[in-house]
UniProtKB/Swiss-Prot annotation:
CDD domains: Terminator_NusB (cd00619). One of its GO terms (cellular component) is cytosol. The keyword Transcription applies. This is Transcription antitermination protein NusB. Belongs to the NusB family. The gene is nusB. GO terms for biological process: DNA-templated transcription termination; transcription antitermination. Pfam families: NusB. SUPFAM superfamilies: NusB-like. NCBIfam families: nusB. GO terms for molecular function: RNA binding.
Amino acid sequence: MLKSRHKMREAIFKSLFQWDFNKEEILEEISKEHIVSLEPNLQELAVNYLKGIRENIDVIDEIISKYLKNWTLERLSVTDRNILRLGTYELIYVDDIPIEVTLDEMIELGKTYGTENSGKFVNGVLDKIAKAEAPKEKFEL
């Protein structure tokens, strides 16, 4: 299941990455090509994640911006920006995923798709967000 969830996060990231270039496209439509190979229950979960991210994008971006030091969201690479969006969504809005799992998964996405510094950068920003913004119950998972 863990490897399957990793594939799901990867599909969500790829959908967000593509959507970032053309916000006129419907995110859920873009995602179809990326989530088709997932198990049916994970396809549904991926769609829920994407819907949640789209509906809360302004709040998510505001939270990320608050914890960027010497950067703006717009100056980040498309890769780092969308990994941070996915990670922030999971930290704030998904109750049953432990913080450490989210951080580890986002670091891996950063290492796979970003620059040599993406993993460390993503970890630093998401760690600050987790400590300050994540629901307290998540620290007990």
